[in-house]
Amino acid sequence: MRESVINVLFYLFDDILTEQDGQEADLNQMAHWLSEAGFAHEDVGRAMDWFCELGKIGDYQPIIQTNPAVRIFSPQEAYFIDEEGQDFLRGLCRAGVLDTQLQETVIERAIALEEPLSLETLHWVVMMVIMNTGASETVWERKWSQIWLVDDDDHSVMQ
């Protein structure tokens, strides 16, 4: 059965990693579990590559912006992140949830999924990036709660 890489990653984070209960998971074992769950070998490989790249974020150091700039999305980026998603990311930057470094990481991870993203999936990518910055749990929990405070009319982060 052919699934998207996004579905494989959802399964990985929701079912496999939550069962690990804080234990470090072996990548080969995770790939094996995903294959046993019925995901295609190619999709499992791409999902594991995405997961490994996410882990390289490491110890993130926030950037203090003195002159905020507006991010213009390239045509390739706009293919994967539609206008609604772009507005969402701009709102997160305005609210201080993302700085330019984190925004670029989110965009890079979104494009790496190689398919246009729904707003819900973009929320998930943002959460995964923030959780992997090495920030304290309190910091990412606060940011995570801000991510979901979205006005349905214009998709800007409410303050």
UniProtKB/Swiss-Prot annotation:
Pfam families xref list: DUF494
TM region positions: none
Family in the record: Belongs to the Smg family.
UniProt protein name: Protein Smg homolog
Species of provenance: Dichelobacter nodosus (strain VCS1703A)
